[in-house]
Amino acid sequence: MAARSLEIGPAGMLAARTIEILRTERGLGQRHIAARCTALGRPMSNTMLSRIELAKRRCDIDDLVAIAEALQVSPAALLQGPGAA
């Protein structure tokens, strides 16, 4: 049986958009954030981060926590939208 990809819901879409907005507002590249996540113990490539931002890859809770720490915001801020950070 072929694996089905899981649909990304509204919260995932909002988090993806918020990650991209906060990253670009801070003038940080995807490689920088991915490297910070890796340094924090959550291996991530810039391609993985790009796919998360484009909502082509699901962002699991461990990804979310590492990305939030790399962006110096709370994980909740990523779920609430760019105005919450």
Set out the residue ranges of the language-model regions.
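Residue-level detection of the helix-turn-helix DNA-binding "recognition helix"
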Residues: 24, 38-39, 54, 83
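Short alpha-helical DNA-recognition segment
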Residues: 27-51
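Short intrinsically disordered terminal tails
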Residues: 1, 84-85
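A short, Lys/Arg-rich alpha-helix, primarily the initiator
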Residues: 1-26, 76
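DNA major-groove recognition helix of helix-turn-helix/homeodomain DNA-binding modules
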Residues: 56, 60-77
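Alpha-helical residues within the helix-turn-helix
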Residues: 24, 35, 69
